[in-house]
Amino acid sequence: MGSEQSAEAESRPGDLNASVTPSPAKHRAKMDDIVVVAQGSQASRNVSNDPDVIKLQEIPTFQPLLKGLLSGQTSPTNAKLEKLDSQQVLQLCLRYQDHLHQCAEAVAFDQNALVKRIKEMDLSVETLFCFMQERQKRYAKYAEQIQKVNEMSAILRRIQMGIDQTVPLMERLNSMLPEAERLEPFSMKPERERH
């Protein structure tokens, strides 16, 4: 009985002196710890006929430009870098700088020519715009005069219609008068054209 009490005292969780060691059954099993006892129901696949494996084998292999800078290597090898001649690299950079300078000069020359041409075109367009404005003002005056002529023409047409309605009435009235009191026939033509 005393030994049971001492065993209980050791296994109490509130006791500070009790050493806690997890049992191996409570550990999570890893993939390496699992042992397959029975063969699965799947038929064994032939890896050489797998389309994904065939596609992976068709991918060509690539080598990095600087082999010393592979991700797996901790210290890059400077063997390839040491073979580059610094004078030749400097000459290459200077030639490239000269090429860029020439390109910049060509672009600046073309840009200045374009700016000059744009200014010339602006001046031409402004001159043409002023000329067209003057012309438009002139044509606006002509259009105003034509409008007045159209209004006068409409008035004259109304007068002509009134005369055309009045002349037959005058002739009828004139024919009712005695012979001695009759007027001469009415005519719109000037007197010299009548003779």
UniProtKB/Swiss-Prot annotation:
GO terms for biological process: lysosome localization; nervous system development; organelle transport along microtubule; regulation of endosome size; regulation of lysosome size. GO terms for cellular component: axon; BORC complex; cytoplasmic side of lysosomal membrane; lysosome; membrane; plasma membrane; plus-end kinesin complex. It is found in: Lysosome membrane. The modification Phosphoserine is found at residues 71, 75. Keywords: Lipoprotein, Lysosome, Membrane, Myristate, Phosphoprotein. Myristoylation at Gly-2 mediates attachment to lysosome membranes. Residues 1-31 are annotated as: Disordered. A lipid is attached at residue 2 (N-myristoyl glycine). It is a lipid-anchor. Pfam families: LOH1CR12. Component of the BLOC-one-related complex (BORC) which is composed of BLOC1S1, BLOC1S2, BORCS5, BORCS6, BORCS7, BORCS8, KXD1 and SNAPIN. Interacts with ARL8B, KIF5A, KLC1 and PLEKHM2; links the lysosomal BORC complex to the microtubule plus-end-directed kinesin motor. Belongs to the BORCS5 family. As part of the BORC complex may play a role in lysosomes movement and localization at the cell periphery. Associated with the cytosolic face of lysosomes, the BORC complex may recruit ARL8B and couple lysosomes to microtubule plus-end-directed kinesin motor. Thereby, it may indirectly play a role in cell spreading and motility. This is BLOC-1-related complex subunit 5. It comes from Mus musculus.
